Every structure is written in C-alpha cells, then in structure tokens.
Swiss-Prot record:
Belongs to the SfsA family. InterPro entries: SfsA, SfsA_C, SfsA_N. One of its GO terms (molecular function) is DNA binding. PANTHER family: SUGAR FERMENTATION STIMULATION PROTEIN A. The gene is sfsA. Signal peptide: none annotated. This is Sugar fermentation stimulation protein homolog.
C-alpha cells in the first residue's frame, strides 16, 4: 500500500490566485485572463489561497465558474483541496486495508437520526460502523489542525457520533491530513473551541478518532502514515 496511489482527476490548468469573492468562488489568472474558480472546501484556506499563490484547476462544462479548484502548489508540496473527494479517499483507505482492516464500505451517506454520516461500514463480525470524514489542510509547526474556520456543522457531527456510540453503534471520525510536514493531529482549540470540546467528548464516549497522513503528487494521492492524536488544550 505504501507504494500505491489513488489516481486523482488530473487538472488541465495552472494559474495564479488573485482573490476570494465568497466562500465558494475565487478569481485566478489562468491563460492570461481572470477566471472564476469554484472552491469546494468551505474552510478559510488562508495559508494556501492568497494573492500570488499557484493553483491547479480543471475546466468545468457548466455553471457560473469556468474552473474547479483541485490543488494549491507551495514551494515544497502540492496540497489537495477538493473536499468533494474526501469520502472517496476514505473509502479507498478502508477497502485497501490501511484503515480499519477487515471492514468494507456498505453505504455512502447513511441516514442516522436527523442527519447523515459519510460512510456506513460492515465489520469482520458483521457489526455496523458509522464514519464521519474530515479533511485537514492547516498545518502549523508540524501540527495538523482542524478546523481552519469555525464549524457549527462539524461540532454537531461529533455530538451525533457520540450519540451513535451511546446507542450501541461503532463510531469513527477520520481526519485526512493533507500536509507534508504534519507530524501530529490536534483539534484547533484556538479557532473553534466548541468543535474541539465536542471531539474530546466524543472520544471519551467511545468514538474512535483516526488521523491519516496523505501526500499529493501529480496526480495521485499516496498514503504515508497514521499520525498520533493530541486532543488536549
């Protein structure tokens, strides 16, 4: 598995980011013209998307934006930022046996309570496991941090996982760490204390917490290692 990559949709344009218009739309210079780029990741991405940063995007066939942001190119790494692919990545890790060996993906976006989780798994003994997947693109001093912007929805997901565990389900949260220099994962207490507290409570309630480090190359995603987790303030 260490030498296997998950193929990514290959971008067809390289550009220079100029500014963010709103949560999901930015402007980049591509091919000598200013183009609208769809940004699927709702986070701030402030350390990645700033005037002058180099981006990779693929052409869209429909919609108000002509391009879809795939990755940001830093001096020494590519950072994959297409959050729409997180479930696919987690499914690949599970089906490959790297994460939760012996489990298989039974369903995507299973309903639970008043909402949905990302994956429903079936374990080696027939047990059901609910999984929530989060992508991590913020790294500070070797520490991968989530979230990079306050997320009421993320905190609610942790609370729902804790309830699922209390109801007898096996429950997991998987953090996909997409930064090369990350050596440990932590919740971002400074940015979103509510989420950090909800994650810590979920862990104490029996929710399994995983952090998986991945590296982006042109154009595939490679599993690197499982990172230690520090939930302390």
């Amino acid at each position: 598995m260490a030498h296997v990559c998950l193929p990514l949709d290959e971008p067809d344009a390289r550009g220079v980011f100029k500014r963010r218009l709103n949560r999901f739309v930015g402007v980049a210079e591509i091919g000598g013209a200013d183009e609208l780029v769809h940004i699927h990741d709702p986070g701030r991405l402030a350390e990645l998307l700033y005037p002058g940063s180099v981006i990779w995007a693929r052409r869209k066939k429909t919609g108000k934006t002509r391009y879809y942001l795939t990755a940001v190119e830093l001096a020494d790494e590519l950072v994959f930022v297409d959050s729409a692919k997180h479930n696919k990545i987690a499914s690949w890790l599970i089906e490959s046996g790297v994460l939760l060996p012996g489990y298989r993906v039974e369903r995507h976006e299973p309903a639970y309570g008043k909402g949905r989780f990302d994956l429903l798994l079936r374990g080696p003994k027939g047990e059901k496991a609910l999984v929530e997947v989060k992508g991590v693109t913020l790294e500070v001093g070797g520490r991968a941090l989530f979230p990079d912007a306050p997320t009421t929805r993320g905190a609610r997901h942790m609370e729902e996982l804790a309830r699922a565990a209390a109801d007898g389900f096996e429950a997991h949260v998987v953090f996909l760490v997409l930064r090369k220099k990350a050596a440990v994962f932590s919740p971002n207490w400074e940015m979103d204390r509510r989420f950090a507290e909800a994650l810590a409570r979920a862990y104490k309630s029996g929710v399994y917490v995983h952090a998986v480090k991945l590296e982006t190359s042109r154009w595939c995603l490679k599993y690197v290692e499982k990172l230690p987790i520090d939930l302390q303030l």
